[in-house]
Regions:
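C-terminal and inter-domain tail/linker signature
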Residues: 1-326
Length: 326
């Protein structure tokens, strides 16, 4: 079923819509356009929780632009997929470069647009990269960031059949085999910890771009990056909240975007200070490039500063002792 142009007009297509609207607001400083672009009661799920209403988006955008006026965010990818006849879900990978401070980082904004208006958004930023490049202490930054918590769809159980219906609604049955392969990989390698199976899904010369603006190559590099992410929360599990696919020559072929939440307890490696045993929720988005039935590249974005914020804000006076004696 073709997408009605009312979903993205006056632009050429959803890709053009996302690129141009983003530039209009963030580069040309048309912050007031947000009132036209977002519904008044738009829902935004970020790394620190859920906010409702366009005013917080306007105010937050103004503060970010003012704090980093030389930063330019440029689209590396736009993975979009229809949601009915008049709506689409886009996964917008943004590469931000600030010429005055020389920091570089990535953001992924997954946006549900209906008739050209933002209804719901899931946005994650690599704040760790900025902290490290600017010489800031990640823990000090985290301590002044409030974790509000999630509401709305994020408090409901993860969709049972995300290939049919995700948090953004019913999706078209496109590229089922490739999307199913990505979900199988997440379940087998990420959740069941079968790290030996990386080669089953990936090419040898794989590339992983992840937080801290770090890049890993080859299966062993991928395994070590995943282990590093999981070791503070070894009993946690990934929940897949949404999936979208899109094929475009411009972006090297088929990409599969996955919105996920990792839920665990800080009872493993003490990477973020003394253990607390308290729960953490990590909202993340991964964009996978698939070529010839194999995974080639992943861009994985989540906010480690928000993770540290949850741990710091939930830290009590008593000392937590791990019960794992293996």
């Amino acid at each position: 079923m073709p997408l009605d142009p009312i979903a993205y007009k006056p632009y050429a297509d959803p890709d053009d819509f996302i690129r141009e609207v983003t530039d209009l607001i963030w580069v040309d400083r048309a912050i007031g356009h947000i009132y036209e672009n977002y519904e008044p009661d738009a829902i935004v799920h970020g790394s620190y929780g859920t906010s409702v209403g366009v005013e917080e988006v306007v105010q937050g955008s103004l503060m970010r632009i003012s704090a980093t006026p030389d930063r330019v965010g440029q689209a590396e990818d736009v993975v979009w997929e229809a949601r009915g006849e008049d709506a689409f879900l886009s996964s917008h990978l943004v590469l931000s470069v600030d010429q005055s401070t020389d920091f570089i980082s990535r953001t992924i904004a997954n946006c549900l647009y209906r008739r050209g208006r933002m209804v719901e958004e899931w946005v994650v930023r690599d704040s760790l990269a900025i902290c490290q490049q600017l010489g800031q202490d990640p823990d000090e930054v985290a301590r002044v960031k409030p974790f509000i918590g999630y509401s709305g769809s994020m408090t409901e159980p993860a969709p049972q059949n995300v290939l049919a219906v995700g948090d953004s609604g019913e999706r078209p049955d496109e590229y089922r085999a490739e999307a199913q392969m990505v979900l199988e990989f997440i379940d087998r390698v990420w959740n069941r910890r079968d790290l030996n199976a990386v080669e089953h899904y990936w090419i040898r010369d794989l590339v992983l771009h992840t937080i801290g603006y770090r890049t890993f190559t080859r299966p062993e590099g991928y395994r070590r990056a995943l282990l590093k992410m999981l070791q503070p929360f070894p009993g946690g599990r990934f929940e897949v909240r949404d999936v979208q696919t899109h094929y475009a020559v411009r972006y090297a072929g088929l990409r599969v975007a996955v919105t996920w939440v990792y839920k665990g307890d800080y009872n493993g490696a003490d990477d973020f200070g003394p253990l607390t045993g308290t729960p953490v929720e990590i909202l993340g988005v991964s964009q996978f490039l698939v070529q010839d039935g194999r995974l080639v590249r992943e861009v994985r974005v989540y906010d480690e500063i928000a993770v540290r914020s949850q741990i710091h804000n939930r830290r009590g006076d008593s000392t937590y002792a791990s019960t794992n004696i293996y």
